[in-house]
Amino acid sequence: MRAYVITIGNEILKGRTINTNAAHIGRVLTYAGYDVIRMVVVPDEIDEIVWAFRDGLSRADLIVSTGGLGPTFDDKTVEALAKALNLELELNQEAFSMVKSKYDRLGVELTKERIKMAYMPKGAKPLPNPVGTAPGVYIEYAGKRILTLPGVPAEMEAILDEALPQLRVPGRYYYEESVVVRGIMESALAPVVNEVMRLNAGLVYVKSHPKGIEIDKPVVEVEVSASGSSEEEVRGRVKEAIRQLVSRAKSINPQCC
């Protein structure tokens, strides 16, 4: 199963806000059994957001967006989603109740800007926001699933956590483990990584992440990961690949790891 992540917001493109949401969503979806095939960032513009949703629908089974669900003029995600799916944008009564109850508790007026957060594509299901006010949106379309989340990290994480059980890919497990290799330059370790990949072709993925200075104080974290239908199986594959890697690295520098 493939997943596609969309981050919406001018502040991301300007570099004013670091895109931690995409990293969190990608991590969660990977452990939920998905292959995250693409992450895109688009501005707060209807046509750009429509393009992103349609591109995601053409490539993946699950599309997750973050950002653009609030009450301001530049929060355009649900409008763009409705347009992308050729669906009517309507006031969702369940979402309206969620939004109204939040503001009733605060004792503030339910303005048109606040009611805006209850509009959704026809047939969408609102997802409660335990942290903020804007509900998440879940909809199934043409055999694909779409989840839109707020841009505020705490709100995004809370709604995603609640939605995760219904999103998880059944019978699909992911496991990864890392080993830190010291005193071997990444360029010298590269043949070892290549050899371990060759020995485990199609079974594991091995990726080196340099943490030190290549020439002076080389430190390389090597990540080994695998996916499969059995948790025990993928764990075993990863551990065997790490054993192979450490054995070969020690032939270069016995004190490396």
Curated annotation (Swiss-Prot):
Gene3D superfamilies associated with the record: MoaB/Mog-like domain (3.40.980.10)
SUPFAM superfamilies the UniProt entry points to: Molybdenum cofactor biosynthesis proteins
Domain of life: Archaea
Pfam annotation, one family: MoCF_biosynth
Stored InterPro entries: CinA, CinA_Arc, MoaB/Mog-like_dom_sf, MoaB/Mog_dom
Family: Belongs to the CinA family.
PANTHER family: NICOTINAMIDE-NUCLEOTIDE AMIDOHYDROLASE PNCC, NMN AMIDOHYDROLASE-LIKE PROTEIN YFAY
Protein name (database record): Protein Cmaq_1209
Annotated organism of origin: Caldivirga maquilingensis (strain ATCC 700844 / DSM 13496 / JCM 10307 / IC-167)
